[in-house]
Amino acid sequence: MKTTIILILLTHWVYSQNPTSGNNTATLCLGHHAVANGTLVKTITDDQIEVTNATELVQSTSIGKICNNPYRVLDGRNCTLIDAMLGDPHCDVFQYENWDLFIERSSAFSNCYPYDIPDYASLRSIVASSGTLEFTAEGFTWTGVTQNGRSGACRRGSADSFFSRLNWLTKSGNSYPTLNVTMPNNNNFDKLYIWGIHHPSTNNEQTKLYVQELGRVTVSTKRSQQTIIPNIGSRPGVRGQSGRISIYWTIVKPGDILMINSNGNLVAPRGYFKMRTGKSSIMRSDAPIDTCVSECITPNGSIPNDKPFQNVNKVTYGKCPKYIKQNTLKLATGMRNVPEKQIRGIFGAIAGFIENGWEGMVDGWYGFRYQNSEGTGQAADLKSTQAAIDQINGKLNRVIERTNEKFHQIEKEFSEVEGRIQDLEKYVEDTKIDLWSYNAELLVALENQHTIDLTDAEMNKLFEKTRRQLRENAEDMGNGCFKIYHKCDNACIGSIRNGTYDHYIYRDEALNNRFQIKGVELKSGYKDWILWISFAISCFLICVVLLGFIMWACQKGNIRCNICI
């Protein structure tokens, strides 16, 4: 009886051991790289899926300063572009300046006779895109009037002065004759003329300066005509002046003629600005300008353009990422992450990719782990790794190429009377941003889905390649591992990895070992049940033996049993 019990317990222990730990078998598992803490990305089918690595696609911060390279950035300091163009005394340093981007500061102010420009935004945009304040004086003949009017509101140094690009005409003696002046454009470029009309604060000031009780200014070309009549009346005082000057502008094409007719209140041009076509622009910003390199500028400062999208500012200049609403979009640049289970059981069994990934595999994305007579080991499969990396590399650059703007997004400005146009423009811009935000999210989700499917496919391809090599010499264990039924040392494992494994060499040995092991080994589907039954029978037999011993001892008188009621 004792012998039977010992044999049953021994058999139970033997069945509990790892059947692949012998010298005549080996275990080969295929797996992929994993990390302890992956990155969540969005795909077409999942809002959140964990991958081993991902790249942020949205630039959400600027460097806090505007780089002056590779663009010529002109700091307007205390001057607006229009004041610099008109020749405000405190902006004389900007005469004949050139720029790619003119930076207007919030601290900019006018320091001359108070003026308004009915179409300020258009004039500002035209001058900004020209990229220069190059000015050419012309010999206008103003007969019978006094030129070079001045004002105490516009001082140049300690003397009264006026805008350097404009000529304020007043009466000569007690007369102001009707003026008729023409100026042809015989050049092959457009000319921009700036002129204006003075609005006195009182009728007395009107006759004192221009004799006539009501003046008039008409400026014409072959294509256009503007007639302006002064609005006489008191206005809030600015730098001691309650009068105003309204500034207008006229573009004269090659072969056209500029005609000026006036009987009073004319602020005449002194020459023209040469119009240029280019990609120069203007931007309002208080960010400091520094010596650095950046191809994208926003009012918040320059930003890198190595990402396809940005959430810093809608207004940009240069080669910039596309503006979207999202603060973050992550592009998967690694495979699906399945963190490795830290506890593998009593015998430290290895597991394949079906169960989890492998942490610590730094030399490749896909690889092998094995157990054989020489111990355990791990090696990466560089071919499948490179195949996946080659297809993922360049993905970010392709997204950038599709989305980076090669032009600047200018500020949209409209006068108060164009409120409906401004509302429409805002609606169009917001709609464009909404569409781009949606397209960006969809594009990234598609790319992420493709990356994950691609890396999964490479894993399956490697598994199928290994299975075709091993054939009947091994059995698929269902967890990404193969049980090899012949002795397979490290050299043998290496031949499987590099594709030189010859299954015919090991075929006979594998078949013999398979039959021998199958005679003892139990299929995993029934093994647990048999082990539990064996354990139950063992316990039952122990109880029977113990009960028989007690009964035998009672009969011999070695044990006395008293039952008390």
From Swiss-Prot:
Palmitoylated. GO terms for cellular component: host cell plasma membrane; membrane; viral envelope; virion membrane. Residues 1-16 form the signal peptide. The keyword Lipoprotein applies. One of its GO terms (biological process) is clathrin-dependent endocytosis of virus by host cell. The chain crosses the membrane at residues 530-550. Residues 551-565 are cytoplasmic. A lipid is attached at residues 554, 561, 564 (S-palmitoyl cysteine). Binds to sialic acid-containing receptors on the cell surface, bringing about the attachment of the virus particle to the cell. This attachment induces virion internalization of about two third of the virus particles through clathrin-dependent endocytosis and about one third through a clathrin- and caveolin-independent pathway. Plays a major role in the determination of host range restriction and virulence. Class I viral fusion protein. Binds to sialic acid-containing receptors on the cell surface, bringing about the attachment of the virus particle to the cell. This attachment induces virion internalization either through clathrin-dependent endocytosis or through clathrin- and caveolin-independent pathway. Plays a major role in the determination of host range restriction and virulence. Class I viral fusion protein. Responsible for penetration of the virus into the cell cytoplasm by mediating the fusion of the membrane of the endocytosed virus particle with the endosomal membrane. Major glycoprotein, comprises over 80% of the envelope proteins present in virus particle. The extent of infection into host organism is determined by HA. Influenza viruses bud from the apical surface of polarized epithelial cells (e.g. bronchial epithelial cells) into lumen of lungs and are therefore usually pneumotropic. The reason is that HA is cleaved by tryptase clara which is restricted to lungs. However, HAs of H5 and H7 pantropic avian viruses subtypes can be cleaved by furin and subtilisin-type enzymes, allowing the virus to grow in other organs than lungs. This is Hemagglutinin.
